[in-house]
Amino acid sequence: MTRIVSRVEPWAFTLLLAVAGCGKQTADAGPTAEAVEENLVSTLNCAPGFNKFIGPPPAGVLPFIPFASLKTVENPVIGINRVTGAPALRADLASYVADMNAAIQLGKAFFWEMQAGSDNKVACATCHFQAGEDARAKNQLNPGGNGTFDGKSANYALVAADFPFTDPALGRNGDNIAGSQGVRPSTFVSISSTGVETTVPGSDPVFGTMRQATGVNAPSTINTVYNHRNFFNGRAQNEFNGINPFGSRDPSAHIWYASSTTTVAPLSITITNASAASQAVGPPLNPVEMSAAGRTFPELGKKLLLLKPLGLQTVSPTDSVLGALVAKKGGKGLNTTYGAMIQKAFQPTMWNSNAPVTLNGKAYTLTQANFSFYWGIAIMLYEATLIADNSPMDQYAATRVFDAVGNVTAENVALLNPVVSRLAAEGINITTNDILYGLELFEKPIPPPGVAGLPPSARFGGTGIGSGVGCNFCHVGAETTSASVRNLTAGVEAGDMAFKAAGFDLRMERMFMGDRTQPVVAPQPFPPVPLGADQIVYDNGNYAVNVTSINGVAVPARPMKVNTYDVGWYDVGVRPILENPGVGGTDPFGNPLSWTEYFQKVFASPQTTFKVAGGGLTCIDANGNPVVPPAAPLTSPFAGEVLDPANNLPIISGGLLKTEATDVAGSFKTPHLRNIEFTGPYFHSGGKSTLKQVVEFYDDGGNFPNATMPAIIRPLGLTPSQMNALVAFLVALTDDRVRLQQAPFDHPELIVPAGQDAAGADITTTIPAVGATGSATPISRFLALNPFAAQ
């Protein structure tokens, strides 16, 4: 995402923020006010005789962040044996997992298991059966913030004309959410000795006795293991505690281990880079998604341990994971038990004891007591196999070679031809040049202030490497999300890697906030400050300052503030903040979900131990040599820190202060983009139905001018051909294995609730079992819509 001031790179940020450094002022005329209404501002001045400097990147660093194949990124859950090249169990998991392949089998069975729902109908897969998401249209509406369906009903069947839910240009401002239908309201009673779950039917104030719909659109479970945290609001923590989604935030969470075959003892665990496990243990107990109210994981374990795995569903004998467990004579389910699968998958210390475990006054076996642990770890390992990294764009990106300034010198464009052919068969005509221009718009830097339009590269009739719209500021790296494990622990950009090496916490940063609730104002004087002084902590109000363009001319700007936020979570103006706080909400323990605000709360001292990146300022002398003028004595606690001596880049950031302003309210996780063609409806609200609507949303600068929006979210002024090019690029991110349900994306049969009839009975849709070779019939887009259509 945008930085306060540039890192060592990417120099796209330099062009965007125009605060990379200082150089002698030029005499060029400044841009017009109309051209730079949305320009960003500088809060730092150079020493006398110097001015803002924008220069070429350091040697070996491209002037943009190129899109890369996901094959270049290590799987954060399943490692690779460096000798054989085969998948290998991660070292920290070996203490718990005895057989990785057996655990993956267990995880796939758990994920697709309809009997896990209190009604024996809702599995994890029920909301994630198509490209990792939910493609149903009926009984999917949640009433949103106002509590009413705005002329529709809970059992309403969505149609194309309903979208977009919100669009100021169309006079639409609907707060309904396209969520996922779960279970009917009920209260848990018991599990019988034969695995029958008894519940008492209930009624919900909004949904009555119908299936309830979630208040957030279902995110994809494909590539989900690359996320540092999961769920749109980030509540599924990076570290798994074995019990619930909240990781180390829940100090009481613990599992049990067999200290002997006759004794058990509590065990507190913290398994890092395991947010998929944290996420997996949430829905099975959620009274809207899968469970009767009051059911516990030991009770769910008691039930499933008594039932035939996948006993209500057909499994293909050629299933890439479960085929070996299918009975030779056919029929439904697997020819094994969940108890046997657990004992094969996990170390004996996790299940081998006859001693009872007493929980809430009830006695359970060790296997029942640890069922949440098995569930989370096994599903995480299964989801770690659901990696879509073979799209035509992934294949093409792997062939690109760049020269020192970012021009492509070698490539294999023919790898994009299957996208063109596939769409042509549907009557949708694009070219490989459309895809490549969309890629350019996605990955190339935003042009500097005062430059009209988006000058293309030489390939498309312009000069140089071309310019873009900054998509990959948030959709960064091969993972196409700044919320990735790699970005938040090691860094994707070269500058972030350097910050990590310097001891900075990459989970947070200080950033210019757009605050488009404020009007554009005339230039105002901004007094010089000592180089290196930290203005951002002590001047958090809405102040008007001079914009420094590449020639140093001040033009009208919006008042800008600089606040701290959680990297990877952004408010892009989908809905008003008060309707859903996102990562600005709280966990069940009353603490902020946001790392930034959580660390501010839990540290007693005014300044925390977390070093938060803010940026740097480099100046050049009359000869163009980079220098760092000595700073005057400062009261700022961050003065004098140096990130990269080779580039003389002083840091103007430091420990997170308890008192500094934050911008986390209304922010949601940046999703990855692979298979996005098939993951509609879009955004956490599910309010857009096609990729064209998504691109139009960003072209408008969002739908709501929220105060917590990043400054980069602004009207883009895209032409129709540029919007279509971006859609073409996004379609090229579809992995055909996902589209055709080929291994590892094959699956058991699933009988999916899809609304109710006039008598109140479930309407169901059967998703047939598919084996490793996939299906001849590809999956469909949401409502079978053309991704290039505005409606």
Predicted regions and their residues:
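Periplasmic c-type cytochrome electron-transfer domains
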Residues: 23-791
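Bacterial N-terminal signal peptides that target proteins for export
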Residues: 1-12
